[in-house]
From Swiss-Prot:
Name listed for the protein in its UniProt record: Lactate utilization protein C
Family: Belongs to the LutC/YkgG family.
Protein purpose: Is involved in L-lactate degradation and allows cells to grow with lactate as the sole carbon source.
HAMAP family: LutC
């Protein structure tokens, strides 16, 4: 028997079932939750209430939050890049970025999924990584990024700073709504992402004395750019 393997499982279960006087049930029963507190968090909150919660929590997790309309996104990105003294910018390969910021994005490097090693080198040297959030949670000021070609986790992890563009339309109360969406994709046989990344501001670490250090395991600074009309 190889380590970590299970043998004779069916025979074992058959013996137990026989002693209990019933057949072996191979399909697990569907269990309904008696209580579903996850559905009650921010239930019935208005769009403005979700946004206000998101603003408040973003401050707690040491994240800059900038808000603008799509017409001002180009200038907003430029000013943020200047504030962070960014000279080398790496963006995920999403045509929406160049469409929303045609002038500022002219100097960006773009993630090339056909050349992952070269793209990783760009990420290592980049001052800022720019991505687009697929969802955002008001409860924890967490953003969600789906992993797929051209949209590597490396872009938001290796550069010194990270700027995430958040269309306001993707703001939801909490993780529950995104989990339900992903479950629907799997259940309906639709294409689901290769991976799901949850990002809650810059990386944090604390020692036994609770001295907080920001930016040890990832970006030193994270900025959310929330765009109201997207």
């Amino acid at each position: 028997m190889n380590p970590g393997t299970i043998t004779n499982r069916e025979d074992f279960l058959q013996r137990i079932a026989k002693q209990l006087g019933r057949e072996v049930k191979l399909t697990p029963p569907k269990r309904e939750y008696t209580h579903r507190p996850q559905d009650e968090v921010l239930k019935g909150a208005s769009e403005e209430e979700l946004l206000e919660t998101f603003r408040m929590v973003a401050t707690r997790i040491h994240t800059d939050l900038v808000e603008c309309e799509s017409a001002k996104l180009d200038d907003t990105l430029r000013l943020l890049i200047e504030r962070y003294h960014g000279a080398r910018i790496l963006a995920e390969n999403d045509e929406r970025i160049s469409a929303w910021a045609p002038t500022t994005s002219e100097t960006f490097d773009w993630w090339d999924s056909s050349q992952p090693e070269a793209s990783r080198e760009l990420a290592i040297r980049a001052d800022i990584g720019i991505t687009i959030a697929d969802a955002a949670f008001a409860e924890s000021a967490t953003i969600v990024q789906y992993a797929m070609p051209g949209r590597s986790r490396t872009i938001s992890l290796l550069p010194q700073d990270h700027i995430a563009i958040i269309p306001k339309s993707v703001l939801v109360p909490r993780m529950t709504q995104t989990a339900q969406q992903l479950a629907t994709l799997d259940r309906d046989g639709l294409h689901s992402p290769n991976g799901v990344n949850f990002i809650s501001g810059p990386s944090n670490s604390a020692d036994i004395e609770m001295n907080l250090i920001v930016g040890v395991h990832g970006p030193v600074r994270v900025s959310y750019v929330l765009v109201h009309d997207l």
